[in-house]
Design a protein with these regions (language model features):
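Polar/charged low-complexity regulatory segments
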Residues: 1-27, 74-76, 80-111
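Charge-rich, low-complexity N-terminal segments
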Residues: 1-67
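Short, charge-rich, low-complexity alpha-helical interaction segments
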Residues: 93-141
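Hydrophobic/aromatic side-chain positions at a characteristic register within alpha-helices
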Residues: 154-161
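Conserved tryptophan-centered aromatic signature that marks the ligand-binding surface of SH3
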Residues: 161-167
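Short, charge-rich amphipathic alpha-helical segments embedded
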Residues: 167-185
């Protein structure tokens, strides 16, 4: 299995989480370390800001977040604060969303925002994750750079006659533009 740049970004983000945050549950630390070292699992995880209702999701909380320490839900299954979560995740063979609950009073984690953006750019059939775009914070200059990059990718996809990529990058560009429309209303 090839390691993509996105998988490196995910591993780097997990390292960052383990180094900069303390989690409420030891199971969270076990899982993050396991995911980081498991090539098949790192490929299947998708970090999220907004939970997608019908997706299997692992939720973990840092120590000062006002939510439950760890929970896993998939379909009708809901596990909270139990070692069984570890076993469910390591046996998981499909896409798995990972939500990290931070302290709401603290500033947004910019590293999370960076990873969310990288995932949105890399995932062509990730429409379910587009809500995350409305919560990512970036400066005006960063936004302009992203818009410029997206326009370049759109032009390239047109030159290559790649309709899928054209639609994907156009959709992301429109989401960025929509952020400002919703801000004004």
């Amino acid at each position: 299995m090839l390691d993509t740049r996105l998988n490196f970004e995910k591993r780097d983000f997990i390292e960052y989480l383990l180094f900069h945050y303390q989690f409420k549950s030891r199971i969270s630390v076990w899982l993050l370390n396991f995911i980081k070292m498991n090539h098949a699992l790192i490929e299947k995880i998708h970090f999220v800001d907004q939970i997608v209702a019908d997706h299997p999701t692992l939720e973990m909380a840092v120590s000062d977040a006002p939510v439950i320490a760890i929970q896993y839900h998939e379909g009708e299954t809901l596990l909270m604060n139990t070692d069984e979560i570890f076993h469910q995740v390591i046996r998981h063979s499909q896409q798995l969303d990972v939500k990290i609950h931070f302290n709401h009073e603290a500033n947004r984690d910019l590293r999370l925002d960076h990873l969310l953006l990288q995932q949105l750019l890399a995932t062509q059939n990730g429409d379910a994750y587009h809500k995350d775009m409305y919560h990512i914070e970036f400066s005006n200059s960063t936004e302009q750079q992203i818009i410029h990059l997206l326009k370049s990718h759109i032009d390239l996809s047109l030159n290559l006659k790649d309709i899928q990529l054209f639609k994907h990058y156009t959709k992301i560009l429109n989401l960025i533009k929509l952020r400002h429309i919703t801000d004004k209303t």
